[in-house]
Amino acid sequence: MAPKFPDSVEELRAAGNESFRNGQYAEASALYGRALRVLQAQGSSDPEEESVLYSNRAACHLKDGNCRDCIKDCTSALALVPFSIKPLLRRASAYEALEKYPMAYVDYKTVLQIDDNVTSAVEGINRMTRALMDSLGPEWRLKLPSIPLVPVSAQKRWNSLPSENHKEMAKSKSKETTATKNRVPSAGDVEKARVLKEEGNELVKKGNHKKAIEKYSESLLCSNLESATYSNRALCYLVLKQYTEAVKDCTEALKLDGKNVKAFYRRAQAHKALKDYKSSFADISNLLQIEPRNGPAQKLRQEVKQNLH
């Protein structure tokens, strides 16, 4: 007796998933297509299921190098369930492969509004930023399409999904890729980094800390060997009450320069705001070993001391 050929949406999707895992992308694509036709013929409204099928078929197109059909299917998936992470990432990858860097940047950036821990989006943004700076120059941000504002409901939907979805795509965003960390900047990169850092400094003077963060981030993409750039970005994070980010940047700054007084002071401030008084006190103590007469540090030490007891 011949094996039963799958005919329900669930069976077709499961068969498609199996073919995809086995590297049979054309077969998987056909199975997802059949599942879509069956679902649509039923006339029942199940946008989540339909969106997943479009997104899965898009993954097949991407594997086969068919970027235009990948973009088309991802767009269909997103029309059904806006701000879904997988189709956004797949469409971004397809745009990137077609060298449509502004469109790829927008999709990666949209993903990071939903979940800023998605490593592939962090890495994608870094690649697109470098590509756009090279192709469009320092004013590249002005030439981008508008980036949609992600509603809170979309963020909540993602956070409510099973943890497997997050594990599949998310790692700590503080871990830069090995390629970026190990890349030795050229003299041109170092100069570009210096100019961008100065632009960030000017924005700080004007009180525009959000824009300054963008400039410092671009600077660090060109060269991540400048301790002051990390500690300057940390200041912006402090002002914006993003204390965990400030701690991370100060730590990076101190890895590069163990006597960076500003990094010690700003990390102490961030630790204090996070109510980690022990770490704050340790940072102030280290700072005062370098600069015993630092007035602001002495004052901060007194404030932290009161909270330690």
Swiss-Prot record:
| Record's keyword annotation contains Transmembrane helix | no
The record's listing under InterPro entries reads:
CiliaryAsmbly_MitoImport, TPR-like_helical_dom_sf, TPR_rpt
What GO CC annotations are associated with the protein? Answer: cytosol; intracellular membrane-bounded organelle; membrane; mitochondrial outer membrane; mitochondrion; nucleus
Q: Give the transmembrane region(s).
A: none
Q: Where is the composition biased (Basic and acidic residues)?
A: 164-178
The UniProt entry's GO biological process terms, in alphabetical order, are: protein targeting to mitochondrion
UniProtKB keywords: Chaperone, Cytoplasm, Isopeptide bond, Membrane, Mitochondrion, Mitochondrion outer membrane, Phosphoprotein, Repeat, TPR repeat, Ubl conjugation
Q: Where is this region: Disordered?
A: 161-189
Q: Which family does it belong to?
A: Belongs to the Tom34 family.
Instruction: Write down what this protein is called.
Output: Mitochondrial import receptor subunit TOM34
Organism, scientific name = Homo sapiens (Human)
Name the gene that codes for it. Answer: TOMM34
